[in-house]
């Protein structure tokens, strides 16, 4: 017997991928309902040969649902996730609204589902940030072998992580200047870009070392930098893990990448790391990971694994990870958690 599933934010970028994956993975759903904001109410979305009418998430009655997959932003999740949970629905939330709540497990399906997901006093499970997500299946394997103590990370985050607005901004700017792009070889001001709205500087043919928003705490960090630290600690179960991150937006449509320098308590050679990662769940070992290769792939791609000479005693590794921020980074992990929950419901 199947479960009754709802997608809140079904008309959005991640919601679209969720709908596709539910079908592709033959999720055991006896009934499916789609929810979004009031402006999408009444719109019809195709699913498994049916036309399903979108409901207003703020006014719809969630009774009868077993699981609701939320990807409608933090403001919606803060209000509606508890309302759905109060109706007996298990909520899996893709926003940042609940990640820091000590009573809400923050789960990556391959990493900490068994340890954390069965205890959910608020009826909510949080999905991590897409940048953190790409690294977790890789780092968990290495942590189990040699105990992770420190991470220094630079991220290379695709514009789809900013939603449809980020995608549109990159495409518009690239189209506007592509005819004379060679002029930028010698002078970054040689061409006039359409004014940026989503980012603080043009994103086409550029990188912007400020992904997210600056946090008003004197640290000089963005919320993306801080998510990387907090979420890595919570997911891996290492509360004292040292994490320094610089999150950068790059002119890539889909696929977040991370350059990682990892320090361990015990020696760990590149050869042993490759042996551990080859065939690990949620991981694909490759020579040169790229975001283009990762787009549309379920696993995190990891490669360029080498000794970090800045860490003594063979306790440091440098590596590069790429992952699809819309697929595993958001929609897929949510659905994998739902699949694992079927045994509980």
Curated annotation (Swiss-Prot):
Active site residues per record: 130 (acyl-thioester intermediate), 256 (proton acceptor)
What's a BP term from Gene Ontology annotated to this protein? 'de novo' L-methionine biosynthetic process
Q: Which Pfam families match?
A: Semialdhyde_dh, Semialdhyde_dhC
- Keyword Iron-sulfur in annotation: no
Binding-site positions, substrate: 157, 249
Q: Which UniProt keywords apply?
A: Amino-acid biosynthesis, Diaminopimelate biosynthesis, Lysine biosynthesis, Methionine biosynthesis, NADP, Oxidoreductase, Threonine biosynthesis, Virulence
PANTHER family on file: ASPARTATE-SEMIALDEHYDE DEHYDROGENASE, DEHYDROGENASE, PUTATIVE-RELATED
- What does the subunit section of this Swiss-Prot or TrEMBL entry state? Homodimer.
Under which name does UniProt file this protein? Answer: Aspartate-semialdehyde dehydrogenase
Q: What is the lineage of its organism?
A: Bacteria, Bacillati, Actinomycetota, Actinomycetes, Mycobacteriales
Q: Which gene encodes it?
A: asd
């Amino acid at each position: 017997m199947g479960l009754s599933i709802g997608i809140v934010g079904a008309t959005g970028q991640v919601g679209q991928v969720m709908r596709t994956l539910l079908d592709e993975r033959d999720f055991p759903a006896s009934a499916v309902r789609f929810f979004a904001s009031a402006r999408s109410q009444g719109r019809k979305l195709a699913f498994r040969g049916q036309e399903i009418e979108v409901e207003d998430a703020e006014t719809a009655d969630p009774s009868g649902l077993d699981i609701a997959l939320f990807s409608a932003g933090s403001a919606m999740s803060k209000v509606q996730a508890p309302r759905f949970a109060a109706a007996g629905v298990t909520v899996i939330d893709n926003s940042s609204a609940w990640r820091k709540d000590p009573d809400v497990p923050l789960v990556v399906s391959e990493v900490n589902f068994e340890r954390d997901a069965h205890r959910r006093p608020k009826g909510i499970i949080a999905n991590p940030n897409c940048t953190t997500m790409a690294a977790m299946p890789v780092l968990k394997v290495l942590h189990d072998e040699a105990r992770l103590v420190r991470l220094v990370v630079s991220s290379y985050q695709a514009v789809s992580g900013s939603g449809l607005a980020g995608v549109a901004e990159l495409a518009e700017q690239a189209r506007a200047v592509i005819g004379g792009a060679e002029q930028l070889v010698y002078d970054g001001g040689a061409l006039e870009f359409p004014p940026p709205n989503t980012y603080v500087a043009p994103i086409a043919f550029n990188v912007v070392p400020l992904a997210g928003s600056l946090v008003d705490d004197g640290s000089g960090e963005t919320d993306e930098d801080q998510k990387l630290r907090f979420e890595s600690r919570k997911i891996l179960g290492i509360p004292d893990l040292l994490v320094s991150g610089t999150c950068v937006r790059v002119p890539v449509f889909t696929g977040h990448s991370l350059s990682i320098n990892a320090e361990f308590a015990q020696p760990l050679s590149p050869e042993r790391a490759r042996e551990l990662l080859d065939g690990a769940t949620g991981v694909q070992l490759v020579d040169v990971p790229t975001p283009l290769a990762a787009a549309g792939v379920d696993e995190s791609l990891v490669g360029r694994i080498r000794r970090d000479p800045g860490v003594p005693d063979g306790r440091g590794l440098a590596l590069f990870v790429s992952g699809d921020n819309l697929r595993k980074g958001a929609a897929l992990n949510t659905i994998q958690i739902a699949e694992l929950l079927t045994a509980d419901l």
